[in-house]
Amino acid sequence: MSEPLPITDAPKQRKPDWIRVKAPMGQAFSDTKALMRRLNLATVCEEAACPNIGECWTKKHATVMILGDTCTRACAFCNVKTGMPRPVDALEPQHVADAAAELGLEHIVVTSVDRDDLPDGGAKQFVKVIEALRRTTPRTTIEILTPDFRNKADAAIEMIVAARPDVYNHNLETVPRLYPTIRPGARYYASLRLLETVKRLDPTIFTKSGIMVGLGEERLEVHQVMDDMRSADIDFLTMGQYLQPTPKHAKVADFVAPKTFEAYAAIARAKGFLLVAATPLTRSSYHAGDDFVKLRDARNAELARKAAVPAA
């Protein structure tokens, strides 16, 4: 059963200059949109009203959202529609692979809505998408951004990890104190355990997680989330500014200045993340392809450093 969406009716605040982006336009943008329509694919870029859609789609980058466009939950920060989803589309995995091939993607990000109505939470569809991508465009690296799978997490994670995506992303979204109002359908430590389990099952898979700031969190709370992530051996941290999608969603508590993001990034790097992306416009899949290359290079550099240290 869906949780009720907190009704705030808070008017959207005027964004500072560092948040503003150009309106999407251009032939490449139009071509990407047309391709997604033709293959009957949803994208989180559109459904979540991502501010970077113009830049990404112009570069023919898109984050595909599988399992439909309707979520069984109603988080206070998310613009994806809530309700009873349609049945799973058996053709969707191949359509995702066809889109990746047609766009010539070197790296693809695949996410989904929450599907609490399904016995496996949608895990089998993630596996089928990964398998279709490996068959159709084997050189494309695969990043998945999954939900928490609620009470089905153990079986779901084992199934997906066995399919061997290159990056497993699951966002913590915010600090634990704000979960009851911002992410009421989820549990902070369950999400943390999910990522810890991925790394335990297959240490070669990169793990990634992100949080939003500007929801009323304290800096020390953000630092604690970083520590929790490192305890779970998460490789890559993303941080971005929360933006209120509609007046019905949670209000922006504050617009975090770029210098504060720089400070957060420096602290995160000192805590041992392989890679950190922290800017007002950072989103989970923003520059994901370039970041995957950096992530791989950072791991190789770390392994080389360890190999160079003589055994005690």
Curated annotation (Swiss-Prot):
Top-rank EC class of the record's enzyme: transferase
Pathway(s) annotated for this protein in UniProt: Protein modification; protein lipoylation via endogenous pathway; protein N(6)-(lipoyl)lysine from octanoyl-[acyl-carrier-protein]: step 2/2
Span of domain Radical SAM core: 57-274
Cellular component GO terms held in the UniProt record: cytoplasm
Principal subcellular localisation of the protein: cytoplasm
EC code: 2.8.1.8
Highest rank taxon of the organism: Bacteria
UniProt subcellular location: Cytoplasm
Catalytic reaction list: [[Fe-S] cluster scaffold protein carrying a second [4Fe-4S](2+) cluster] + N(6)-octanoyl-L-lysyl-[protein] + 2 oxidized [2Fe-2S]-[ferredoxin] + 2 S-adenosyl-L-methionine + 4 H(+) = [[Fe-S] cluster scaffold protein] + N(6)-[(R)-dihydrolipoyl]-L-lysyl-[protein] + 4 Fe(3+) + 2 hydrogen sulfide + 2 5'-deoxyadenosine + 2 L-methionine + 2 reduced [2Fe-2S]-[ferredoxin]
CDD domains reported in the protein's UniProt record: Radical_SAM
Binding site for [4Fe-4S] cluster 2: C71, C75, C78
Keywords, alphabetical: 4Fe-4S, Cytoplasm, Iron, Iron-sulfur, Metal-binding, S-adenosyl-L-methionine, Transferase
GO molecular function: 4 iron, 4 sulfur cluster binding; lipoate synthase activity; metal ion binding
Residues binding [4Fe-4S] cluster 1, per UniProt: C45, C50, C56, S285
Cofactor list: [4Fe-4S] cluster
Cofactor note: Binds 2 [4Fe-4S] clusters per subunit. One cluster is coordinated with 3 cysteines and an exchangeable S-adenosyl-L-methionine.
UniProt record similarity statement: Belongs to the radical SAM superfamily. Lipoyl synthase family.
Record-given protein name: Lipoyl synthase
Gene that specifies this protein: lipA
